[in-house]
A protein has these predicted regions:
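Adenosine-nucleotide cofactor-binding segment
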Residues: 1-59
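C-terminal hydrophobic helical "lid"/dimerization subdomain
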Residues: 11, 58, 102, 106-153
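Short, hinge-like loop/turn segments at secondary-structure boundaries
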Residues: 21-26, 44, 87-90, 112-116, ...
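Conserved beta-strand scaffold positions in the cores of enzyme catalytic domains, especially
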Residues: 24-25, 95, 122, 126
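Glycine-rich phosphate-binding loop and adjacent beta-alpha segment
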Residues: 54-114, 152-153
């Protein structure tokens, strides 16, 4: 992968994506016009939907090229959700589900162990175990953190 675009509604995850090497970041809190304009000139081959929202899934379907792939990673709400099924059919999109934490866990451990993945770059804060309640509040605040690690004190 040489061209990676990350879209989010919060500035902190976008700044983090830039630090990790994203080619382009797009703040979609005010709408998706910029993302759609970029996709209109160069549709994406693959889109990973990680927000777990129907709007996120519809957006991913809308920005991939004909024959592109949309991978649903975010946990969608239960029940029926509106999906632009005609766009999936007309654009011949490959819509894939991904059950996180299934068989991938051992693969992830192996990638971390052999150094293929630098997990420390994902850590945005370390807090002592004695401050666990505050650390958990920080971890829930996407505007300030990506991953928070508790350390033994």
């Amino acid at each position: 992968m040489t061209d990676v675009t990350v879209a989010d509604i919060a500035p902190a995850p976008l700044a983090f994506a830039t630090r990790l090497g994203a080619s382009h970041v797009e703040n979609v809190s005010g709408g998706e016009e910029g993302l759609k304009a970029q996709a209109a000139s160069r549709p994406y081959d693959v889109a990973f939907e990680v927000s777990g929202t129907a709007a996120g899934l519809a957006s991913a379907i809308g920005i991939v090229r004909r024959g592109g792939v949309v991978v649903q990673i975010g946990n969608l709400p239960g029940g029926q959700i509106p999906t632009p099924s005609n766009a999936v059919m007309a654009k011949e999109i490959d819509l894939r589900g991904s059950f996180r934490f299934g068989f991938e866990f051992m693969n992830a451990v192996e990638l971390i162990a052999d150094g293929s993945v630098d997990v420390l770059s994902l850590v945005t804060a370390e807090r002592p175990l004695s401050t666990a309640p505050d650390a958990l509040r920080l971890a829930l605040d996407r505007s300030q953190s990506v991953k928070v690690v508790l350390t033994a004190n």
